[in-house]
Amino acid sequence: MSNFTAKVPLSERMADVLISKDRWKDDEEGYLKVKYGLEIILINVMKFAIVYGIALVTGLLLQTVTVHLSYLWLRRYSFGLHATKTLNCTLISLTMFVLAPFIFQNIPSNNWIVLGTFAFILLNMFLFAPADTESLPLIGEEHRKKLKRKAMIGTLILTGIALLIPFAEMKTLIMVGSLFQVISINPLTYKLLKRRYRNYEKYE
């Protein structure tokens, strides 16, 4: 294998194989857009396979799904940080969605803990959601206000689910996933990772 090939990411090499460049010879920009989109899909598929494959093998599938869905439910409207490198993203995902469920799976929580935790989460959604990134600035004040409202409503809905669910350990896992999302929108996290906060200000 040549040094050049070794340095090209697997997702990019797979995208090159799946897309015939000859078909796009008259539209280089279109080719690059399609290739980039396919790379993103391949990266996410591979990351999903790694995370859920390990969760399945270790008997943590339900716990992983619970933490992941709670995280995604809030992230849908509150956005937040993304890892800048695929390897970092995969390692963070394994920590959040496999290691954390393993650690917290047998820790029960009662509804008082749920109320206290989600009050903290709701406050963070009010103060910091939505949080953008350098590659995805959230432009438009009205747009951001709508996202904030939806993020807060989503938090209240998830609070209700956590309160009503009869399994004490499941309550804990829902809170863990939700707190991961709080970390991703908190300005302190941006500062610690030396990432730019309020990226929309550059365009408004």
From Swiss-Prot:
GO terms for biological process: proteolysis; quorum sensing. Keywords: Cell membrane, Hydrolase, Membrane, Protease, Quorum sensing, Transmembrane, Transmembrane helix. The chain crosses the membrane at residues 51-73, 87-107, 111-131, 151-168, 173-190. Its EC number is 3.4.-.-. It is a multi-pass membrane protein. It is found in: Cell membrane. GO terms for molecular function: peptidase activity. GO terms for cellular component: plasma membrane. Belongs to the AgrB family. NCBIfam families: PRK01100.1. May be involved in the proteolytic processing of a quorum sensing system signal molecule precursor. This is Putative AgrB-like protein. It comes from Listeria innocua serovar 6a (strain ATCC BAA-680 / CLIP 11262).
